[in-house]
C-alpha cells in the first residue's frame, strides 16, 4: 500500500535522480568549434550516402581507430526524409525531400505529392549564377541525383530523366554512370551529342 508520505518520499527520490542526471550531463565534455558564423562558404558540397543515417555514422565512428571526417564538421543537423505516402521512404521521395524541401510520394522525383514540379536547391543556386554539379557512383539518372535536376512521376522512367538531364541549363558538371540511357534509345536520339552541341565536353574515361 502506498501512503501519501511514501509517495512524497518516492517523488523526492525521483526528482533527486533527475537533478543528478542533469548535472552529470551539463558537466560532460563540451565540443568547441571555431566556425565563423559571419564568414560565407566558398563552396557548398552536399554528400548523400545511400541509406545512410546516424546509426551508420555511429558505427563508422566506433569501428574507425582514427577520428572520422564527420566529427570535424563544425555543425550538424537532422532532417526528416520520410515520404508523403509511407513512413519508409525510397530514394526518390527521400532525394526530393533533401533537394527541394517538399514531401512527395515514393517513386516520384522533383515534384510534390500533387505532381506539381518544385525547384531544387541546385536549380535555385544556378538561377543565382552559381556553378553546379552532380557526381555519383551510380547512374546519373538514378532517383537521388535525378531529384536535383529532373521532374518525373516515376523514378523508373530512366530515359525520360536522361532527357531532362541532357536538356537542362542549370548544370555545369555531371559525372557518373548510365551512358546507355543517353544513346541506346527508342526515340533514336543521342543525348550525348545533344549535350556536346550545347557546349558540354564529354569524357568516357578518367
Region locations from a protein language model:
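C-terminal motif of bacterial Sec signal peptides marking the signal peptidase cleavage site
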Residues: 21-24
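Short, intrinsically disordered, charge-balanced linker/junction segments flanking boundaries
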Residues: 2, 203-206
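N-terminal catalytic scaffold of extracellular/periplasmic and nuclease hydrolases
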Residues: 26-185, 189-203
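Bacterial N-terminal signal peptides that target proteins for export
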Residues: 2-13
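Core hydrophobic alpha-helical transmembrane segments of single-pass membrane proteins
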Residues: 15-19
